[in-house]
């Protein structure tokens, strides 16, 4: 009998479940489908065989990416090889995603099944998963799902910063909108200022230049020879400046009030600022296209290439389109109208704005548009899937389109595609090596700057951390100096050594010891008196600045102590002699 197992992928790990022996037909009954909602009844049908938790969120993200791409991860392979029976013919594995099922069947040899009964079982497992796995709560499972969802979405959205085509889509859309707005506002300025100076409309055709002139001239009656030089700077043409000056003198326009002029000038300044922003945005779009799709922009131009990417949705979608779709991209209405009325289908869409189709003869427009769409499809695929995109292939493809145009006009045979691509491959490798070399240099410079910055921060932090310790050391030194200063000046009394308490002796022993001490002390006094006087003389010579009173004051406690000792000893001896 074939054993049915079910693989369930969760944010916390893989779960392998086994179905108890129940007929497949009975599982599809409505009563059984309702029993899926009941945990107790669901346990009678399904049991957990093994659970392989993910060690970290990064591992969970890797497994989720592998499942979405239809690749068998090593963790999944280990789980299936460990817990599924060795006899693969007797095992039927139910999975939710057909891609991962096909990959498991191809790599591991297990028969996989999706849909029907498996979908109902997975619905029940998804509902009761936190009860099937021990130690897993509903709250922790929800948190794991939320974290994995955020990281998975972030990985899908996060691409190379230099190759994000979303910025191109937004830029070209804004550029088209700005063109419409500038055109509308310029026409409003022409109508508004035309009541005062109608001849200026015929002389100047450019919208931005007209708005600058309206802002500069103001009241035409104030225009004179002194402003002619400024007019030449704005119009970039001396003849036009002279014509404007002559027309202002003999204009048939009506007079205008000061408040109306103020409003016209403020509105024309807004239009001028919009036109300047449009130029800066166009420059930004060109630089972005050279980074994201250099071959496509070299072949067909930045504006047309950006419109193709925006219409397709992304550069990847454009690369997936065949040449026939690229040819009519942007002409969907005409295409479906032609299919509906069974008329002629359009020959070109957005690529009509390319210069090649405009240069071709009427009978060759369809042929050159088909050839150009083919080259655009190749260029978009090169830009999308090359590691280091360069404009070499786009330049070579442009040369091929030029040769095909000349072939249609003059009959000159173009070069073979194989020869052109060989040259392009060699040049592209050299260009890619040069780009990688520049990038490595930039990275080294950035790392050096980062190291210097970190070293400066570490030095500053070490200085800040050492300052309190240094302050404490200075404070301790100052305290020590304060303590030592009175001793050096002799103002502080030296510590007096108190006589140690001696044990009481017998009276005879005390008398004998007192007599011996008296004899020895008298002998010492006689010997030490001349030496002390001699020894005191060098000290006085060495320190002549110290006053004698202070020195005597510092010596008085020792003398007083010796004198009190000798007097007490004499009194004790006299008392003992009287008692005897």
Swiss-Prot record:
SMART domains: NOSIC (SM00931). Residues 458-580 are annotated as: Disordered. Widely expressed, with highest levels in the central nervous system (CNS), including cerebral cortex and cerebellum, and spleen. In the CNS, expressed in Purkinje cells of the cerebellum, as well as in motor neurons of the hypoglossal nucleus and in the spinal cord anterior horn (at protein level). It holds the Pfam family Nop. One of its GO terms (cellular component) is nucleoplasm. The modification Phosphothreonine is found at residues 467, 545-546. Residues 292-410 form the Nop domain. The modification N6-acetyllysine is found at residues 552, 565. The modification Omega-N-methylarginine is found at residue 359. There is a cross-link at residues 87, 230, 240, 531 (Glycyl lysine isopeptide (Lys-Gly) (interchain with G-Cter in SUMO2)). GO terms for molecular function: histone methyltransferase binding; RNA binding; snoRNA binding. The keyword Glycoprotein does not apply. Residues 567-580 have a biased composition (Basic residues). Keywords: Acetylation, Cytoplasm, Isopeptide bond, Methylation, Nucleus, Phosphoprotein, Ribonucleoprotein, Ribosome biogenesis, Ubl conjugation. One of its GO terms (biological process) is ribosomal small subunit biogenesis. InterPro entries: Nop56/Nop58, NOP58/56_N, Nop_C, Nop_dom, Nop_dom_sf, NOSIC. Disulfide bonds: none annotated. It is found in: Nucleus, Nucleolus; Cytoplasm; Nucleus, Nucleoplasm. The modification Phosphoserine is found at residues 314, 465-466, 513, 522, 528, 536, 543, 554, 567. Belongs to the NOP5/NOP56 family. Involved in the early to middle stages of 60S ribosomal subunit biogenesis. Required for the biogenesis of box C/D snoRNAs such U3, U8 and U14 snoRNAs. Part of the small subunit (SSU) processome, first precursor of the small eukaryotic ribosomal subunit. During the assembly of the SSU processome in the nucleolus, many ribosome biogenesis factors, an RNA chaperone and ribosomal proteins associate with the nascent pre-rRNA and work in concert to generate RNA folding, modifications, rearrangements and cleavage as well as targeted degradation of pre-ribosomal RNA by the RNA exosome. Part of a large pre-ribosomal ribonucleoprotein (RNP) complex, that consists of at least 62 ribosomal proteins, 45 nonribosomal proteins and both pre-rRNA and mature rRNA species. Within this complex directly interacts with TCOF1 in an RNA-independent manner. Core component of box C/D small nucleolar ribonucleoprotein (snoRNP) particles; the core proteins SNU13, NOP56, NOP58 and FBL or FBLL1 assemble stepwise onto the snoRNA. Interacts with NOP1 and NOP58. Interacts with NUFIP1, RUVBL1 and RUVBL2; RUVBL1:RUVBL2 seem to bridge the association of NOP56 with NUFIP1. This is Nucleolar protein 56. It comes from Mus musculus (Mouse).
């Amino acid at each position: 009998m074939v054993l049915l197992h079910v693989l369930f992928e969760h944010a916390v790990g893989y779960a392998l479940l086994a179905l108890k022996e129940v007929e497949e037909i009975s599982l599809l009954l409505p009563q059984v489908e309702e029993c899926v909602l009941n945990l107790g009844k669901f346990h009678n049908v399904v049991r957990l065989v093994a659970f392989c938790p993910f060690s970290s969120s990064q591992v969970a993200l890797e497994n989720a990416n592998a499942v979405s791409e239809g690749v068998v991860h090593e963790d999944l392979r280990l789980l299936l090889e460990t817990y599924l029976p060795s006899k693969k013919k007797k095992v039927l594995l139910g999975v939710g995603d057909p891609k991962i099922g096909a990959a498991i069947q191809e790599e591991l040899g297990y028969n996989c099944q999706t849909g029907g009964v498996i979908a109902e079982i997975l619905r029940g497992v998804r509902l009761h998963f936190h009860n099937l796995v021990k130690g897993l709560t509903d709250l922790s499972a929800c948190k794991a799902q939320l974290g994995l969802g955020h990281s998975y979405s972030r990985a899908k959205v996060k691409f190379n910063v230099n190759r994000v085509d979303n910025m191109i889509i937004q830029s070209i859309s804004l550029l088209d909108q700005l063109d419409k707005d500038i055109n509308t506002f310029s026409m409003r300025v022409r109508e508004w200022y035309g009541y005062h100076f109608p001849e200026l409309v015929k002389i100047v055709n450019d919208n931005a230049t007209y708005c600058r002139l309206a802002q500069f001239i103001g009241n035409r009656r104030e225009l004179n020879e002194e402003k002619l030089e400024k007019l030449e700077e704005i119009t970039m043409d001396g003849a036009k400046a002279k014509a404007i000056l002559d027309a202002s003198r003999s204009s048939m326009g009506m007079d205008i009030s000061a408040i109306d002029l103020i409003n016209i000038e403020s509105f024309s300044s807004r239009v001028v600022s919009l036109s300047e922003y449009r130029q800066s945005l166009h420059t930004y779009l060109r630089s972005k296209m050279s980074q994201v799709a250099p071959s496509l922009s070299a072949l067909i131009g930045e504006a047309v290439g950006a419109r193709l990417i925006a219409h397709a949705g992304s550069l990847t979608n454009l690369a997936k389109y065949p040449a026939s779709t690229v040819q009519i991209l942007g002409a969907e209405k005409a295409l479906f109208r032609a299919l509906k009325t069974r008329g002629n289908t359009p020959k070109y869409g957005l690529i009509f704005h390319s210069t090649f189709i405009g240069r071709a003869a009427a009978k060759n427009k369809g042929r050159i548009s088909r050839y150009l769409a083919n080259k655009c499809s190749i260029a978009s695929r090169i830009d999308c899937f090359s590691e280091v995109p360069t404009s070499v292939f786009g330049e070579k493809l442009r040369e091929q389109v030029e040769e095909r145009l000349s072939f249609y006009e003059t009959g000159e045979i173009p070069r073979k595609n194989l020869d052109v691509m060989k040259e392009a491959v060699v040049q592209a490798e050299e260009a890619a090596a040069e780009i990688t070399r520049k990038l490595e240099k930039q990275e080294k410079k950035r790392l050096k700057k980062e190291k210097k910055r970190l070293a400066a921060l570490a030095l500053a932090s070490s200085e800040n951390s050492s300052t309190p310790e240094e302050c404490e050391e200075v404070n301790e030194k100052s305290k020590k100096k304060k303590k030592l200063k009175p001793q050096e000046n002799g103002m502080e009394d030296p510590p007096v050594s108190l006589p140690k308490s001696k044990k009481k002796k017998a009276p005879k022993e005390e008398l004998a010891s007192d007599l011996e001490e008296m004899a020895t002390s008298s002998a010492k006094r006689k010997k030490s008196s001349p030496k002390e006087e001699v020894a005191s003389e060098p000290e006085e010579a060495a320190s002549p600045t110290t006053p004698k009173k202070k020195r005597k004051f510092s010596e008085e406690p020792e003398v007083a102590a010796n004198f009190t000792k000798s007097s007490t000893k004499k009194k004790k001896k006299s008392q003992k002699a009287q008692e005897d």
